[in-house]
Amino acid sequence: MSYTNTFIKVADDCPVNKSEIPLSKKDKKPLHLIQYELLKENPYKFDHEGLIYEVFVKTKEIPGKILEKDAEKIKTALFSKGHPCLRASALTKRYGFGAHYDDKGKIAIYPMESKEYEAFMAGKTVKIIPAMKTKK
């Protein structure tokens, strides 16, 4: 699912009062850490599908030569099934980041304590939806 002009606010049951940068104790980075790095370094570069694809490529460590040759085949296989949006990401549920989708569906993340986050929450220019709660 992809959104436009939408802000995903931090989950109501988020355990932090201030955003935290995700860390990993393992060699292989978890999905939310890769999402964080991509969105922090490239705000409004990726839409939902682009983000999923980049995270997949980084997670599977697919070499550039294979991507050059088989990118379409990889995308077709990847998107043959559904993928959760950032409402279900640990970034919005656990680490205290809101996600903004602009009018083209491109995504940027904002710490919950930032002025930008407050502006999205106070303004009427975007639809505000909550991240999914961790507990039911």
PLM region spans:
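Non-catalytic accessory regions used for complex assembly or targeting
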Residues: 1-72, 76-85, 104-106, 110-125, ...
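Short, surface-exposed charged micro-motifs
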Residues: 96-100
